[in-house]
Amino acid sequence: MAGIYIAMGAMVYLSISDKLAASLFFATGILLVLNLHNRLFTRVCPLFAYNGSYRPGDLFIAWIGNGIGTALVAILIHFTRFEAGILGRIEEIVIPKLADSPVSLTILGLFCALFVAFAVFVGGIRQKQGTFAQIFYVWLFITAFV
């Protein structure tokens, strides 16, 4: 389900032209993952390293499951009118990345993963679920990387 929640957040992100507003709404996918205890890969990794609450096999399950959930949403969107509205925004995001170097993409990907890990750790572990503090920290870190 985590891949589905993140893909839904991405759908909203892609449909809003204002980047700040879009970033704020993208975080709803992360909040769903945290509050519904789903296995988002970028949640499982830091918790595996931090407190061992996940096993190595959980990393694989989360990775495959996230990919399946995301692919399912992408396939379903393909059959809706929503697809036409977000294709231009997808191109704006993807084209610069295709022109970037592998080293740059790796470094930026690591920073992205760190921001998600911070959101999970500070917002999802250190704060009570559904509190203003949890929502604030998740939105802060996710908005920063998006």
Where are these regions (language model features)?
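Alpha-helical transmembrane segments and their helix-helix packing motifs
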Residues: 1-146
